[in-house]
């Protein structure tokens, strides 16, 4: 826990000085109890920035090859949950479910990877699977400015303003009950994911993935 606190304070200080970090809506994150925080993903900065915006320790789901060697050891001690991207990683998702059921906070990026252009991408069904398995509330979060500061492929960080906005918890218990049954499971997962991405878009005042896709097709 001490390591996490030191890392949190360091990142918060650096982000405030370099990126003029602004955080709002932290009060929406429950102080205790299992919860899933779902955010958009457009930069390698998203993990540390989102983490230092929360007032409780959280475990972050991230791809397996993101860290190696000593860095991987450090991140595991900070709560990282490695996920294999080439296939559905039941082990990684089961670990996230276990931590939430144990009363922990877990962070997921529903898009499954960084957005190349900074715009929101359609969410994948994995987030829906976690919600259906745990019945936990979902706190949506929008990260603005991280793509401008460090987009995919960039060789250096640019000093751009960054903001993090957390929204009110989303409760999917009624939807899960309504769509109970094996035949509706995939549809349920995708619908949960879509609704979460829509709320993230609203927090950022940007187009939701479904709206953007329809606009591109016209």
Regions found by a protein language model. Give the residues of each.
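Active-site phosphate/pyrophosphate- and oxyanion-stabilizing loops and adjacent acidic/basic residues
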Residues: 12, 48, 128-129
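Short gly/ser/thr-rich secondary-structure transition/capping motifs
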Residues: 16-24, 146-148
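Catalytic core of membrane glycerolipid acyltransferases/transacylases, capturing the structured
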Residues: 7-8, 16-17, 29-88, 95
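A short N-terminal beta-strand-loop micro-motif at the entrance of redox/enzyme domains
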Residues: 23, 28, 167-169
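Transmembrane alpha-helical segments that form the membrane-embedded catalytic/substrate-channel core
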Residues: 14-17, 199
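Non-catalytic C-terminal accessory region of glycerolipid acyltransferases
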Residues: 2, 91-218
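Conserved beta-strand scaffold positions in the cores of enzyme catalytic domains, especially
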Residues: 23, 60, 80-82, 138, ...
């Amino acid at each position: 826990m001490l390591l996490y606190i030191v890392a949190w304070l360091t990142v918060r200080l650096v982000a405030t000085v370099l990126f003029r970090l602004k955080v709002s809506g932290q009060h929406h994150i429950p102080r205790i109890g299992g919860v899933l925080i779902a955010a958009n993903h457009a930069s390698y900065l998203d993990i540390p920035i989102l983490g230092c915006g929360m007032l409780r320790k959280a475990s972050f789901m991230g791809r397996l090859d993101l860290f190696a060697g000593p860095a991987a050891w450090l991140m595991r001690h900070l709560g990282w949950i490695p996920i294999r991207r080439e296939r559905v990683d039941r082990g990684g998702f089961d670990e996230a479910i276990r931590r939430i059921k144990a009363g922990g906070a877990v962070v997921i990026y529903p898009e499954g990877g960084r957005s190349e252009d900074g715009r929101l991408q359609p969410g994948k069904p994995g987030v829906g699977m976690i919600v259906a398995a745990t019945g936990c509330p979902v706190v949506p979060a929008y990260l603005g400015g991280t793509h401008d500061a460090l987009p995919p492929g960039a060789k250096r960080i640019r000093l751009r303003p960054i903001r993090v906005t957390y929204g009110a918890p989303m409760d999917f218990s009624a939807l899960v009950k309504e769509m109970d049954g094996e035949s509706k499971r995939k549809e349920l997962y995708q619908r949960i994911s879509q609704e979460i991405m829509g709320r993230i878009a609203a927090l950022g005042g940007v187009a939701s993935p479904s709206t953007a896709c329809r606009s591109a097709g016209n």
